[in-house]
Amino acid sequence: MQFLKKNKPLFGIVTLALACATAQAQPTQGGVSLHYGIGDHYQRVTLNYETPTLWSHQFGGNWGRLDLTPELGASYWWADGSRSPGHVWQASAIPMFRWWTGERFYIEAGIGATVFSSTSFADKRIGSAFQFGDHIGLGFLLTPSNRIGLRYSHFSNAGIKEPNPGLDIVQLTYTYQF
C-alpha cells in the first residue's frame, strides 16, 4: 500500500495507458459532448447530442476511416467584464466529418447552421441571428466510450447581412459515446 501512495502519478499513467491500449474507434451509436471555449473577451460552454454515425467509409491500406456524425447543440456564451450584452444563447446543427487516422486519433471538420438569441454580444453587432459555424479540430479516443479533443470554431453570417465581424473560439471537448 505504501508503494501506491508514493507512486500515485506513475500508477495513474499506467492505468490510463492500459485503458487506452484497449480503445478502438468504431462508428458510434451516438453520444453527448461538453465543450468549454475561450475567445476574444468571451467564453462559451456547449452541450451537444451526437447522432449515430450516418455514413462511414473505410479507406484502403492504412488510411483509416471517415465518419459523418451530426451534432445538435445548445451553447451559452458570456462576455468578460462590462461588455454588453453580457450573454447570449445559441442553437446549432453541424454535420461533422471525422477522419480516424488510426485506432485512437481523429481529425474533424464541419460547417452548419446556428442561431443566436441576439444580434449583439460582447460589444459586437453580428448582423443577423443566423450564423454559419465552421469547425476544425483533432482528438483522441481514451476508451471505447470516452474521447477528448481540441476544436477551433468560427461563427459568421457569411456576408448575408452587415456587420459581419464573426466570433472565434478555441474549445476543449469531452465526448461520452453510447
UniProtKB/Swiss-Prot annotation:
Location of the protein in the cell: Cell outer membrane
Site description Critical for activity, residues in chain: N157
Domain notes from UniProt: Consists mainly of an outer membrane-spanning beta-barrel formed by beta-strands both N- and C-terminus residing in the periplasm.
EC number(s) recorded for this UniProt protein: 3.1.1.77
Keywords (A to Z) from UniProt: Cell outer membrane, Hydrolase, Membrane, Signal, Transmembrane, Transmembrane beta strand
Membrane-traversing stretches: none
Function: Has lipid A 3-O-deacylase activity. Hydrolyzes the ester bond at the 3 position of lipid A, a bioactive component of lipopolysaccharide (LPS), thereby releasing the primary fatty acyl moiety.
UniProt GO cellular component terms: cell outer membrane
GO process annotations (BP): lipid A metabolic process; lipopolysaccharide metabolic process
Residues the record marks as active site: H154 (charge relay system), S156 (charge relay system), D168 (charge relay system)
Protein name, as recorded: Lipid A deacylase PagL
Keyword Acyltransferase applies: no
Topological type in the membrane: Multi-pass membrane protein
Pfam families, A to Z: PagL
Source species: Bordetella bronchiseptica (strain ATCC BAA-588 / NCTC 13252 / RB50) (Alcaligenes bronchisepticus)
Lineage: Bacteria, Pseudomonadati, Pseudomonadota, Betaproteobacteria, Burkholderiales
Primary residence: membrane
Consequence of gene loss (knockout): Increase in relative abundance of 3-OH C10 in lipid A. The most abundant ion detected in lipid A structure contains the addition of a 3-OH C10 acyl chain and a second phosphate group compared to the most abundant ion observed from wild-type lipid A.
Alphabetized GO MF terms: acyloxyacyl hydrolase activity; protein homodimerization activity
Known catalytic reactions: a 3-(acyloxy)acyl derivative of bacterial toxin + H2O = a 3-hydroxyacyl derivative of bacterial toxin + a fatty acid + H(+)
Family recorded in the similarity comment: Belongs to the PagL family.
Assembly mode: Homodimer.
